[in-house]
Amino acid sequence: MGQTVTTPLSLTLDHWSEVRARAHNQGVEVRKKKWITLCKAEWVMMNVGWPREGTFSLDNISQVKKKIFAPGPHGHPDQVPYITTWRSLATDPPSWVRPFLPPPKPPTPLPQPLSPQPSAPLTSSLYPVVPKPDPPKPPVLPPDPSSPLIDLLTEEPPPYPGGHGPPPSGPRTPAASPIVSRLRERRENPAEESQALPLREGPNNRPQYWPFSASDLYNWKSHNPPFSQDPVALTNLIESILVTHQPTWDDCQQLLQALLTGEERQRVLLEARKQVPGEDGRPTQLPNVIDETFPLT
């Protein structure tokens, strides 16, 4: 009597109850007839190296899985339970599968280090050799004449303007938000720039103004969610920047330009117009005061 050759497919059929139990544990159902058809015909015709007798090779299983999970009309969602169960048997094999697992691949040998090339012999010269200076490296960002950013390594930052005398005493008004306070100061003193500037300590402990660097803006934008996704997180970030950097009006515009889309900036502008303080410190309804502080154009 001839001997029967055991293959991965025949092995799964001999242990079909365990195969169905494995599929059930993953929340799917498999049928024996379709299991055989997929293994002996459908997956073979995918031309990814799947053998008719089946295999527990993860490489072959992964190739078939890519075809099955392909988006659109090229995918085969009805075959997902079957390839998922095949992969489960290969990655977490029961005792009857282990003898049929392919041998592990040998580790890739490390490349041999290249032998150093002999250096060219030094030639005699009557004159000393003067090393050539390294060519200047191109800037990371192209220069923009209209940009307020400065090269922090080559330019001396402008000195911080001197302080003013104490404000005259008067009746106290309700405190406004940091943004509105700065905008109100700008409206009341149009001939002067805001004195709340991004500060750093310079020579002789003298405060100096430093505008936002390109890396600051890039890091804030790349490490925080968009305003449309998480407005609270981005609002907290901007409020912390206002406290720690004390930016000018132009700095605020640059910050909003980097962190918000055009539509988001328009929404922020419309909301800010509702909070423009009047002479009593409360939101005003006077159109001329609102337009002077927050023009729409």
Swiss-Prot record:
Keyword RNA-binding: yes
Organism, as annotated: Feline sarcoma virus (strain Snyder-Theilen)
Keyword Membrane appears in the UniProt entry: yes
Record lipid sites (N-myristoyl glycine): 2
UniProt-recorded Gene Ontology molecular function terms: RNA binding; structural constituent of virion
Any one of the GO BP annotations: viral budding via host ESCRT complex
Signal peptide: none
Residues the UniProt record annotates as site (Cleavage): 127-128, 197-198
Biased composition (Pro residues): 100-119, 130-146, 156-171
Protein name (database record): Gag polyprotein
UniProt GO cellular component terms: host cell plasma membrane; membrane; viral capsid
Keywords, in A-Z order: Capsid protein, Host cell membrane, Host membrane, Host-virus interaction, Lipoprotein, Membrane, Myristate, RNA-binding, Viral budding, Viral budding via the host ESCRT complexes, Viral matrix protein, Viral release from host cell, Virion
Region (Disordered): 97-207, 276-297
Motif (PTAP/PSAP motif): 118-121
Motif LYPX(n)L motif: positions: 126-130
Any further remark recorded for this protein: This protein is synthesized as a Gag-Fes polyprotein.
Xref: InterPro entries: G_retro_matrix (IPR000840), G_retro_matrix_sf (IPR036946), Gag_p12 (IPR002079), Gag_P30 (IPR003036), Retrov_capsid_N (IPR008919), Retroviral_Gag-Pol_poly (IPR050462), Retrovr_matrix (IPR010999)
Biased composition (Low complexity): 120-129
Positions of short motif PPXY motif: 157-160
